[in-house]
A protein has these predicted regions:
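Extended, alpha-helix-rich binding/interface surfaces that flank or overlap catalytic cores
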Residues: 2-58, 64-69, 73-77, 81-84, ...
Length: 172
């Protein structure tokens, strides 16, 4: 167990992109690149510091992590919901149109079909009708878990590797 912890710690501490992109194992690569991008953007707070291609990886990775952790309720109503429309575009970009459609339907369930950028506004919506959102989003979670476009991680890792020259550490 200690070896696994040490490996994860090592991957999450990597910041050299040449070293990260040299990783052969896709899971190791995704872990290391995700950690670096989270660090460089303060968990998305400064997403604009990343290239459009790095943003695509970041948004798809965060969606994948959130849905597999706590489902669409977590993604929409927590931090990353503010980028829900951009995440739809990112999914299309990596070749995941069916997953993009699932997210589009999650957004469409919100009033006026709009996911507010503001965290408090999103949470107010959730607390107004918690049962409705949990029930509806649980059904979408199941669709997501079927990976209709294939494993999402494979798609965004392939995309990142294909666009290596577009990834760089932001200027300090």
């Amino acid at each position: 167990m200690s070896d696994i912890k040490d490996t994860v710690k090592r991957l999450m501490a990597m910041r050299d992109l040449d070293e990260i992109f040299a990783l052969e194992d896709d899971t190791d690569f995704a872990t290391a690149l995700s950690s670096a991008l989270c660090d460089w953007t303060n968990y998305g707070e400064h997403l604009d510091l990343l290239s459009p291609e790095a943003q695509v990886f970041y948004l798809c990775d965060q969606l994948d992590n959130e849905i597999n952790s706590d489902g669409f309720v977590s993604f929409i109503f927590e931090r990353y919901g503010q980028w829900a429309p951009e995440t739809v575009d990112a999914l299309e970009t990596i070749g995941a149109p069916q997953t993009a459609d699932i997210l589009r339907r999650a957004i469409a369930m919100l009033p006026d079909g709009v996911c507010p950028r503001d965290y408090t506004q999103r949470n107010d919506l959730l607390f107004e009708d918690e049962d409705k959102y949990y029930t509806a989003y649980n059904a979408l979670d199941e669709e997501f878990y079927a990976y209709p476009d294939g494993t999402l991680t494979d798609l965004y890792v392939t995309y990142a590797r294909d666009h290596r020259d577009c990834f760089s550490a932001p200027e300090k």
